[in-house]
Amino acid sequence: MEFEMYLKNSGIEFLKDHPLKEFTTFKIGGKARYIVFPKSTKQLIEILTLAKDEAINYIVVGNCSNVLVSDKGYNGAIITTVKIDSFKIDGNLIEAECGAMLSHVARKACEAGLKGLEFAVGIPGTVGGAVYMNAGAYDGEIKDVFERAEVLDENLNPVELGRADMRFSYRNSRLKEEKMVLLRAVFCLKFADREDISPLQKANEFSKRRREKQPLSYPSAGSVFKRPPNNFAGKLIEDAGLKGYRIGGACISEKHAGFIINLGDAKAEDVRKLIYLAQKSVYEKFGILLEPEIQFIGEFETPLFVPVDGQNRR
């Protein structure tokens, strides 16, 4: 196959028919036909172009920190950007490639006395995934510091987008809506004033809060559901009596009910069943439909919950 020959001849690292669970923070997932590790945006574009020309299904991922991969795996190419990871700080601007780890970029920004990314120090995803999802925590979001980005549109044409072009909303962006791929992004931060709490101190406080409230000692994909308006998914799930509920090797965390954790041998279907149960229970008790925040890769036996009336009651 031309795709595989190109990878070999170009010296691009790849794995064939390899379990994805080795690369997801959930430690769950079947085999992918290919897992590819480009080292530059040039290689990334070439790989995507060839995959498209050969009609090979593909998905671009970062650190796989916000995904649930099917037990059946993925019949296509998983292209991970984690080796496209350079970034630089120039004054109050940060330019970062798609695979740079957001937490590392954010910490370096804090160390440089820049404020705006303190919330991101504990987020385990890449810059690409963070912009794609408009990642956020502790009242901060990527859209607050985003300046511009170079992306590939659905036809793999390079496009530069500014803040107004991105259509950011809660855990959403134009990249997600139009299946665009981020190559690099520029963030505009502010220098901390002398009377401010230092950005690093603030980031460390957020990290401490995460350790205290989140089940970080178990594999997971972070918050499973988006936050409903004027509420909290974890609280709703807890109030529905599901905290600690277990199916197979997956469990709704006792520490934070907004997390589903892998106790060691969880299957993707175990997680999907818990997601369905949480959605159904919360909807029946409170009339609120929880929307998954995590992304799903592959085919699943267990569906997501769909209310009979087809919409939220409130």
Swiss-Prot record:
Q: Which GO cellular component term is one of those annotated?
A: cytosol
Q: Which residues form the active site?
A: R171, S223 (proton donor), E293
**Subcellular location(s) per record:** Cytoplasm
Cofactors named for this entry? FAD
Q: In which pathway does it act?
A: Cell wall biogenesis; peptidoglycan biosynthesis
Query: What GO MF terms are annotated?
Result: FAD binding; UDP-N-acetylmuramate dehydrogenase activity
Q: What is this protein called?
A: UDP-N-acetylenolpyruvoylglucosamine reductase
Q: Which organism is it from?
A: Caldicellulosiruptor bescii (strain ATCC BAA-1888 / DSM 6725 / KCTC 15123 / Z-1320)
| Gene transcribed to yield this protein | murB
